[in-house]
Amino acid sequence: IGIDGSFLKHKANGKEVVINMPMPTHKEAIKLVLDTLVSKENGVIKSMDEIDAVGHRILHSGESFTSSIVLTDETIAVCDSNSDLGPLHQKANLTGIAACRELMPNTPMVGVFDTTFHLTMPDYAYRYALPTEYYEKYKVRRYGFHGSSHRYVSAVAREYLGQGKGEK
């Protein structure tokens, strides 16, 4: 998005389609994805009404959310307040969410955070040996990332091993 050489790769019905097109904004890129999903030639759904909800991967929840959330004006504002914790990714995530909300105003949106999986760590594991002020004022702590992948892999591993949640 916003660079030369943008493309959308889409595979449907065993056929791969590559659309080379400038995508100067998140909104234009998401519109291209949505148009492709419903296109007569390469689509996989007949209409946008078939999309019941949209899930968004969001980098950082800080300590604000401990699980996935429904995205509302209020929860998005909280996500934005955590942007300083992930300055390279968080704003881009929120820009994509805003574009989806504009293009799909009646479709529920859900935020799934990279960091929530790791929020169960005890304080001795996530706190650094620094003055408490740094933790409280600047949110300096270990957060952990790629939590949605870790959650999935650990669930599949538990299933494979025949163990329930929380078993060791």
Q: How would you label these PLM feature ranges?
A:
Residues 24-28, 32, 54, 70, ...:
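Conserved active-site and cofactor/substrate-binding residues in soluble primary-metabolism enzymes
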Residues 15-18, 73-76, 128-132:
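Short, low-complexity, polar/charged sequence segments that are solvent-exposed and flexible
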Residues 37, 43-89, 110, 116-127:
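Short beta-strand-loop/turn "lid" adjacent to the catalytic site in phosphate-handling enzymes
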Residues 1-62:
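N-terminal glycine/serine-rich phosphate-binding loop of ATP-dependent small-molecule kinases
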Residues 21, 78-82, 134-138:
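Glycine-rich loops and low-complexity Gly/Arg-rich segments
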Residues 31-35, 77-81, 102, 155, ...:
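Charged/polar, solvent-exposed surface patches and flexible loops
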Residues 18-21, 85-88, 141:
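ATP-dependent adenylate-handling ligase core
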